[in-house]
């Protein structure tokens, strides 16, 4: 592929300003404008100028995923809506998609890894999804689930929706960044120097990054990944989307994509990002315990990973205005209790 064709392909993978505006306008009527909570005592402890948590954990279905799912469903034709949709998901998109689908009067079938958290499967079913479980063995859990979703789409003539590698998903997720900027502007508060955001397949962080690149270009969005699943970091470092070998496990079940999506990577590589960082499970458990201790905020591990990254890099952030994207809260209560007990310093 020559350079001109490559640039044209990348443009098709990056949401336009016009589409982001349409998505933001549409979502105002259906999405929750989630709280932006200031944590001055932790800011003082870390010697930051300010610290806010954007609680996407309080979005419909308990994570940011509803934003992209709804806007993607809005793009379906009437014929596609009649036939229904299918997608693979490790859990959070599995819950968001049936709710988004119901808004437009269609049905959702979800393929999930058999080891996805039970609460995510049960909640997906309670929201109206028809859930199919897959065993993955030594293969990547999302690879196997994606293959099954493709087979179902072909067999049942359903629209196949990708949970993160989709320009419309990214446009929907950009609304999170716009809400943050609007809230800070109303408060006459400085825009952030850094935004810490988890990176799995890249659907959330690419939307966040595109929103800030447009309205706060000096803000650096920092990708946060669990150890062994740093595909975004490796991809940005080498300049192309890179597939990892499965070599690790993590309590961050929503951040186990072995490769960033083409559309998210096109977005992230088109702007200047913050330096990607890696967190380990011990740091994530400590961040979960800290969020609960400070504000009784309940986060799933993936949602707490950005806070863990801030704690890890606190010395580098002194004097800065920081935003943490708390992306989700879908976790078994008994697992949450166990993790925060393990995360409390001895």
Sequence positions of predicted segments:
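PLP-dependent amino-acid enzyme catalytic core
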Residues: 1-346
């Amino acid at each position: 592929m020559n350079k001109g064709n490559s640039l044209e392909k990348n443009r098709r993978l990056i949401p336009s300003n016009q589409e982001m505006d349409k998505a933001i306008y549409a979502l105002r009527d259906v999405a929750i404008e989630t709280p932006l909570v200031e944590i001055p005592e932790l800011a003082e402890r870390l010697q930051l100028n300010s610290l806010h948590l954007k609680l996407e954990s309080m979005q419909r279905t308990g994570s940011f995923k509803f934003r992209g799912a709804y806007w993607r469903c809005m793009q379906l034709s009437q014929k596609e809506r009649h036939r229904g949709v299918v997608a693979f998901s490790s859990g959070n998109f599995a819950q968001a998609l049936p709710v988004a689908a119901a808004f437009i009067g269609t049905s959702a079938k979800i393929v999930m890894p058999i080891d996805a958290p039970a609460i995510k499967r049960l909640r997906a079913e309670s929201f109206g999804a028809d859930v199919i479980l897959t065993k993955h063995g030594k293969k990547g859990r999302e690879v196997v689930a994606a293959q099954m979703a493709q087979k179902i789409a072909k067999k049942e003539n359903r629209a196949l929706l990708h949970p993160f590698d989709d320009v419309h998903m990214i446009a929907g997720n950009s609304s999170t960044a716009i809400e943050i900027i609007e809230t800070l502007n109303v408060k006459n508060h400085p825009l952030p120097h850094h935004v810490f955001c988890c990176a799995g397949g890249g659907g959330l962080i690419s939307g966040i990054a595109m929103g800030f690149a447009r309205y706060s270009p000096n803000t650096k969005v920092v990708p946060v990944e669990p150890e062994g699943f740093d595909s975004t970091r490796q991809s940005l470092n080498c300049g192309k989307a890179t597939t990892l070998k499965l070599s690790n496990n993590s309590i961050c079940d929503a951040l186990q994509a072995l490769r960033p999506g083409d559309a998210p990577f096109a977005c992230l590589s088109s702007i200047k990002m913050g330096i990607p960082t890696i967190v380990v499970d011990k740091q994530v458990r400590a961040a979960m315990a800290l969020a609960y201790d400070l504000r009784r905020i309940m986060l799933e591990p993936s949602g707490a990973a950005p806070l863990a990254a801030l704690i890890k890099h606190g010395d580098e952030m002194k004097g800065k205005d920081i935003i943490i994207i708390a992306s989700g809260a879908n976790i078994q209560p008994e697992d949450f209790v166990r993790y925060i007990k393990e995360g409390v310093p001895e």
